[in-house]
Regions:
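Cytosolic/stromal cytosol-facing helical appendages immediately following the last transmembrane segment
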Residues: 2-7, 11-15, 110, 119-130, ...
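Membrane interface segments of multi-pass transport proteins and intramembrane proteases
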Residues: 2-7, 37, 41, 62-87, ...
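Membrane-embedded alpha-helical segments that form the functional core of polytopic membrane enzymes
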Residues: 14-17, 76-104, 158-159
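Transmembrane alpha-helical segments that form the membrane-embedded catalytic/substrate-channel core
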Residues: 19-31, 91-106, 162-178, 188-194
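Membrane-helix interface linkers and caps
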Residues: 20-46, 61-78, 223-227
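Juxtamembrane helix-capping/reentrant segments at transmembrane boundaries
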Residues: 34-56, 119-131
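Core segments of transmembrane alpha-helices
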Residues: 53-60, 133-147
Length: 274
């Protein structure tokens, strides 16, 4: 029994995405960018959320084209190159996801959409899609709106979009050191560590630094910040976070201590960028 060529074509970006995942895992262990703290139960939590991410992706992969149909503002599918469709969709998507990311840091939205992702003290490939299922679903919906009714991508173009977007997230969350010049082109692990910095959690929102530079949220960095994530104990409270409880606000440290820590972290960020 032969396999349809379309299935082979669709499988290629998925296989390459899996290969990029494996490559970053290997690089993290062969040449880690810095020593990561130990976090009890981290791998179990990360595996659980990753399985949820995979399930949502598989269930919705072909659903969006049925919902949105063929009507679209643009017709990237007319390029007759799914690879270019995917790259074009990813580039356009970085603009929309920059603003969506900033919105997720606003009070209220943070609870539903983003505190789980910022809770780990370990920033590595596993952290890439460590997100609340609601956030994962909303990301998928936004991607679908960009790809189909806006850009008019084909299904195969959407699979290539997932390859570029997924590999990008794996890259800038990976615990690897990168050449300094890369930070002018794409979000690097060093830049993104600033975004996850303990008691800061801001700036460097975009998959590419262009949007952060344009809209005043770029914070330069050529090295990793000393600490990321939530206070000790808070990051392990996955169930309360899934129930939209603000575990960061429940930090038992006195307000003065939290304020001083935030001030120190921000001063450190300014010094690194000077």
């Amino acid at each position: 029994m032969s396999i349809a060529p379309s299935n082979i074509s669709i499988g290629l970006p998925a296989v390459l995405l899996g290969a990029s995942t494996a490559i970053f895992f290997i690089l993290e262990r062969a040449r880690p960018g810095r020593e990561l703290p130990q976090s009890r139960g981290w791998y179990a939590r990360a595996l659980l959320i990753t399985l949820v991410q995979l399930a949502i992706t598989l269930v919705t992969a072909r659903l969006w084209i049925r919902i949105f149909g063929d009507a679209s503002v643009f017709k990237l599918s007319h390029w007759n190159s799914p690879l270019l469709e995917g790259f074009g969709g990813w580039f356009v998507g970085t603009f929309f996801f920059y603003w969506w990311h900033r919105l997720r840091h606003a009070r209220g939205w943070w609870l539903a959409f983003h505190q789980i992702h910022h809770s780990p003290s370990r920033i590595e490939v596993l952290t890439s899609f460590y997100k609340h299922p609601v956030e994962i679903l909303c990301d998928a919906i936004l991607s679908a709106v960009i790809l189909y009714p806006l850009l008019g991508c084909s299904v195969l173009g959407a699979f290539w979009y997932n390859f570029f977007a997924g590999t990008g997230e794996y890259f800038y969350h990976a615990n690897v050191r990168t050449p300094g010049w890369l930070r002018y082109l794409i979000q690097t692990p060093e830049l993104h560590s600033v975004h996850h910095e303990f008691d800061v959690h801001r700036n460097n929102y975009g998959d590419i630094p262009l949007w952060d530079r344009m809209f005043g949220t770029y914070q330069d960095a050529t090295d990793f910040v000393p600490r990321c994530g939530f206070p000790s104990g808070a990051e392990s409270r996955l169930i309360p976070m899934l129930a939209f409880k603000d575990v960061y606000a429940e930090d038992p440290r006195p307000a003065a201590v939290k304020s001083a820590a935030t001030h120190a972290a921000l001063c450190g960020a300014l010094l690194r960028g000077s």
